[in-house]
Regions:
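Helix-loop-helix hairpins and the membrane-proximal interhelical loops
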Residues: 1-58, 131, 137-138, 189-297, ...
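Membrane-embedded alpha-helical modules
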Residues: 109-222, 339-493
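Transmembrane alpha-helix interface/packing and boundary motifs in multi-pass membrane proteins
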Residues: 25-39, 68-81, 156-161, 258-270, ...
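Re-entrant/interfacial helical elements at transmembrane boundaries that shape
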Residues: 39-48, 62, 77-97, 128, ...
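Short helix-coil transition sites and intra-membrane helix breaks within transmembrane domains
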Residues: 31-41, 78-89, 121-125, 264-274, ...
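Membrane-interface alpha-helices at helix entry/exit sites of multi-pass transporters
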Residues: 56-60, 97-114, 288-300, 324, ...
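Membrane-embedded alpha-helical segments of transport systems
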Residues: 67-72, 113-125, 133, 177, ...
């Protein structure tokens, strides 16, 4: 192990590697902050460039895009209530309320530190414990994936802002959106309403832009210039910096969320969005300030960002040890490895251990450099909130439409985003929350596909979910999650009643 580390460090420590990391991070952060563009797109665009590069700088360029894109999604989630990437969807829950309170710098700084913490944690786990974790995740099949998704859906209870019925209905709407298009098992079309272009379904990024950005612009149609002037006067950035006491308070949350993110990321087919929601729910249930969650609680930002960035390292675990990509980005990285003459899988640690350890050490460096770059640019991001509302609205519209169009070069996708935005605006007026819908969209396909595959495995017997230890564990966690929600709700009502008496 020590020899591999020293050899990998020597191979990685070159000017070409550091330049590749720096360029990858900067480009990734910018692309991740544009709603509609994701790290997947950035990696695909840069893949041909890496063909003529040495293996380590080539892979570090792509990993810089991956990590930078994951972190960059939090910037727009916090500033304009629109997650730049699907994994940052949960960050809007507390990030944007902090901006509304005149504390964008505090939220952005916490997102940066949490992203660094989670990313570094998972990079170190990848470096020192990849084979052990890979052996553990090999025991997961369709029943386990289904139960993980059910556990994720149980979170709807705690993010429904006191109205669990509307939260559940929102979750069902999200699942319906996820099921539009081609059946992933049989291949038949469903819920397309005669529109052939819906056969491919609605891309997640289109749904995100519609539900958040377009709906937010519509909800501000009663814009008042005086209100905007007052808002700008209250944004005193010099007096809202993140304190050491607040960072210290979030350390426990970041640690637990990083563990959750690392485990979830190591399970193929899950990803940062699921990890972020699970971590947010866990943080809310265990925090002393759980009543502040959803209203601008810094712990909420630390939970979601440390979790989704913790998946960046752990998604590489099944890729490097078994040749199985953990998410969309690592599926592209699989092709990048093969372009460099390396085939990910069990033999990779034997045949290319020096290069592999160089890449893993480089991932640690990527997260450290991301912290440095973020510290330089975060104050500049925060000043975006000072832009006049009329100009900001125009920028957001152009930003989002360009991002959605660029993702698939389709005006139909732009039209879908506008329709979803109008629908989301109507739901907001009726008192529905957006986040339960997003959770349903993220988990809908995972629930359906793995449930049906589990039924095939068991001969249509539901007993498969309670006879396998890990599936039973996640089902128990789902029941416990719902039970804790109702218990704490009853406890809070009793406390309020006592105070009134």
């Amino acid at each position: 192990m020590l020899n591999n580390l020293m050899t990998g460090l020597a191979l990685m420590a070159s000017a070409e590697s550091f330049i590749a990391i720096f360029i990858g991070l900067l480009a990734g952060i910018i692309i991740g902050a544009i709603p509609g563009l994701t790290a997947d797109i950035a990696i695909i665009l840069c893949l041909p460039i890496t063909y003529s590069m040495e293996p380590i700088p080539a892979m570090l360029l792509l990993l810089g895009l991956y990590c930078g894109g994951t972190y960059g999604g939090s910037i727009t989630a916090i500033l304009i209530n629109t997650p730049g990437t699907p994994s940052s969807a949960a960050t809007v829950l507390d990030g944007y309320p902090l901006t509304q309170q005149g504390k964008p710098l505090k939220a952005l700084t916490m997102a940066l530190y949490a992203s660094f913490f989670g990313g570094l944690f998972s990079a170190l786990v990848l470096l020192f414990a990849a084979p052990s974790i890979a052996h553990f995740t090999q025991m997961f099949g369709p029943p386990e994936y289904f139960c993980i998704a059910v556990f994720g859906l149980s979170i709807i209870a705690s993010i429904s802002n006191g109205n669990i019925i509307k939260g559940l209905l929102g979750g069902l709407i999200g699942i319906f959106i996820a099921l539009l298009g081609q059946d992933s098992v049989s291949g038949t079309l469903r819920f397309t309403f005669g529109v052939r272009r819906l056969g491919a379904g609605i891309p997640l990024i289109v749904t995100l832009v519609g539900l958040f950005a377009i709906a937010e612009l519509l909800s501000r149609s009663d814009y008042n210039p005086r209100t905007d002037a007052t808002r700008k006067q209250h944004l005193k950035l010099d007096h809202e910096k993140l304190s050491w006491a607040e960072i210290k308070r979030c350390l426990k949350t970041m640690t637990i969320s990083s563990v959750i993110g690392t485990i979830v990321g190591a399970i193929p087919g899950t990803g940062g969005g699921i990890a972020a929601f699970i971590s947010y729910d866990q943080a809310k249930k265990t925090s002393k300030y759980r009543d502040h969650f959803g209203h601008g609680e810094i712990e909420g930002v630390s939970a979601t960002e440390s979790a989704n960035n913790a998946t960046t390292g752990s998604t590489l675990i099944p890729l490097t040890t078994r040749g199985v990509p953990g998410d969309g980005c690592t599926a592209i990285l699989l092709g990048a490895f093969m372009l460099q003459g390396m085939v990910p899988g069990p033999s990779m640690f034997k045949e290319h251990s020096d290069i592999l350890y160089g890449i893993m050490i480089g991932l640690v460096v990527i997260n450290i450099l991301m912290l440095i770059i973020g510290r330089v640019f975060t104050p500049l991001y925060a000043n975006i909130t000072r832009i006049p509302y009329e100009l900001m609205s125009a920028i957001i519209i152009v930003y989002c439409i360009t991002g959605v169009y660029s993702s698939e070069a389709s005006t139909f996708q732009v039209l879908l985003a506008v329709i979803i935005g109008a629908f989301s605006f109507l739901l907001r007026k009726l008192g529905f929350g957006v986040v339960p819908i997003i959770l349903g969209v993220v988990l809908g396909d995972l629930v359906e596909t793995n449930f049906r595959n589990s039924m095939v495995m068991s001969g249509n017997s539901l007993s498969i979910f309670v006879t396998r230890p890990f599936s039973l564990l996640f089902l128990a966690l789902a029941v416990l999650s719902i039970g804790m929600f109702f218990y704490k709700a009853a406890k809070d009502r009793k406390k309020q009643k006592t105070e009134l008496d």
